């Protein structure tokens, strides 16, 4: 059964942005929460799901299991281990983690150790040696929220990088499913063509027998030979396509094509789609979550820019020793210490702080627009694939009827040809129609599986519990 998307109201769309609502006042930045216009509501004829009617099963890590194909399951495991883009994005996550750790270090006092040895001379005196050892301590009191904003930006960037990794993983998984389905489709196309070859070879033998008996002309034999050779050429082409798709699978797995082989197997099952899908599951999409985190990071950077207009307040302390003689350096008489607050403020900077603040606000506006674009794109992708699944189901039913009719027509035409009431040209036409109908049905069924994979990708692997793993 094909799904329909439950009515996506103004509040459902705005809920995608709800997590950003409180960020405006957090660091002194005015909220610029991205909004999604109500005109983007989907499927006006869709039914509304009752509240609480759908339980959602978390199967993000193994959504391809809905195709019930053990070989595909094994390939997905290899993908998670060998796909090169995943390793690259994982490195980006580690980089963001290090950036967050660096930002968090600003919350703690900084302790240093200084040591020096110098020789100085005053006008009236003789040269003297000066030895010193000190341990200065400094700490910034985050009165204006600058350090907190830096930490919030680093945290949001870390989460965004993690969502980017999840998006790359999800995209790679979907690409593998699509390539695998195309490969298995090529195998089935090859099987159909092989069966057609056998039928055409029998027809050619029959035609040659009838030609030798003087019943038909040499033209009929030539037509039968052309029909057989054409099917053979098509099967070779399909075999080439299958090999190329196998190479594509190898590259996805991070393996050299020459080192990877995949035996022929069964076609993945078509997932059972639920009656309705809640649009709320779009909030789980990694691209939407990453875009929302980048809005938070940009908003935090506005807070950092605003804090620069206020003085930096902190405390500093210094404990050490100073002496002209090494033997007396660490004695009580050489002890020096200081403790007190500090404040620093930039009075004239040529408009630099204003420019930095304007830059941060522009970046926030851009992040908000990018977020809205990602949401709208997600809605379009889901709507397109839901509509495709619905239409492909109808198309598959109609094409199945066409295949049955083409087979009946071929049987009737062959019987008429044997009876001598029609020419072999009629048989050739009926054979071509039957083969075309069967190959078209395979193509539609393949597109159904691809549409299901796209829907799962659009929903980030979430599926109603009662229909997820039937």
Regions picked out by a protein language model, each given a short descriptive name:
Residues 217-219, 421-443:
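Short terminal targeting/anchoring segments
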Residues 147, 163-278, 388, 392, ...:
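Periplasmic alpha-helical coiled-coil/stalk elements that build and connect Gram-negative outer-membrane
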Residues 25-26, 62, 68-71, 75-78, ...:
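Small/polar-residue-enriched beta-strand and adjacent coil segments characteristic
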Residues 216-220, 376-387, 422-425:
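Glycine-rich cofactor-pocket loops
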Residues 211-215, 417-421, 458-462:
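A short glycine-centered flexible hinge/capping loop motif at secondary-structure junctions
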Residues 73-76, 90, 180, 225, ...:
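Extracytoplasmic/secreted envelope proteins and their assembly/folding machinery
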């Amino acid at each position: 059964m094909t799904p329909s998307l439950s009515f996506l109201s103004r509040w459902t769309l705005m809920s995608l942005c709800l997590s950003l609502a409180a960020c405006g006042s957090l660091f002194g930045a005015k909220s610029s929460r991205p909004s999604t216009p109500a005109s983007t509501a989907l499927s006006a004829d869709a039914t509304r799901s009752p509240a609480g009617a759908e339980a959602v099963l978390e199967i993000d890590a193994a959504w391809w299991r809905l195709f019930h194909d053990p070989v595909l399951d094994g390939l997905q495991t290899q993908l998670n281990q060998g796909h090169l883009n995943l390793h690259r994005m994982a490195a980006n996550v580690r980089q963001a983690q290090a950036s967050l750790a660096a930002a968090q270090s600003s919350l703690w006092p900084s302790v240093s150790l200084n040591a020096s040895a110098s020789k100085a001379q005053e006008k009236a005196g003789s040269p003297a040696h000066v030895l010193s050892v000190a341990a200065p301590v400094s700490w910034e009191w985050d009165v204006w929220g600058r350090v907190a904003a830096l930490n919030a930006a680093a945290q949001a960037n870390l989460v965004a990088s993690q969502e980017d990794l999840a998006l790359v993983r999800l995209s790679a998984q979907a690409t593998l499913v699509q390539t695998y389905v195309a490969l298995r489709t090529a195998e089935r196309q090859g099987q159909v063509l092989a069966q057609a070859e056998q039928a055409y070879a029998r027809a050619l033998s029959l035609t040659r027998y009838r030609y030798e008996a003087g019943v038909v002309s040499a033209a009929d034999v030539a037509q039968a030979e052309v029909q057989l050779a054409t099917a053979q050429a098509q099967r070779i082409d399909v075999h080439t396509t299958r090999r190329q798709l196998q190479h594509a699978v190898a590259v996805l797995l991070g393996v050299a094509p020459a080192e990877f082989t995949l035996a022929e197997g069964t076609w993945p099952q078509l997932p059972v789609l639920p009656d309705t899908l809640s649009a709320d599951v779009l909030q789980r999409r990694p691209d939407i979550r990453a875009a929302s985190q980048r809005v938070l990071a940009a908003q935090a950077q506005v807070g950092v820019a605003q804090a620069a207009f206020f003085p930096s307040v902190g405390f500093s302390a210094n404990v050490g020793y100073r002496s002209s003689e090494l033997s007396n350096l660490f004695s009580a008489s050489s002890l020096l210490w200081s403790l007190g607050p500090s404040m620093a403020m930039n009075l004239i900077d040529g408009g630099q702080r204003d420019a930095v603040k304007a830059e941060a606000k522009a970046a926030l506006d851009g992040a908000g627009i990018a977020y809205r674009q990602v949401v709208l794109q997600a809605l379009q992708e889901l709507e397109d694939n839901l509509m495709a699944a619905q239409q492909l189901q109808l198309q598959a039913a109609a094409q199945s009827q066409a295949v049955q009719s083409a087979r009946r027509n071929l049987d009737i035409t062959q019987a008429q040809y044997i009876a001598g009431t029609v020419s072999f040209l009629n048989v050739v036409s009926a054979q071509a129609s039957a083969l075309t109908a069967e190959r078209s049905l395979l193509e539609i069924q393949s597109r159904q599986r691809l549409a299901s994979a796209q829907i799962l990708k659009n929903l980030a692997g979430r599926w109603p519990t009662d229909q997820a793993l039937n």
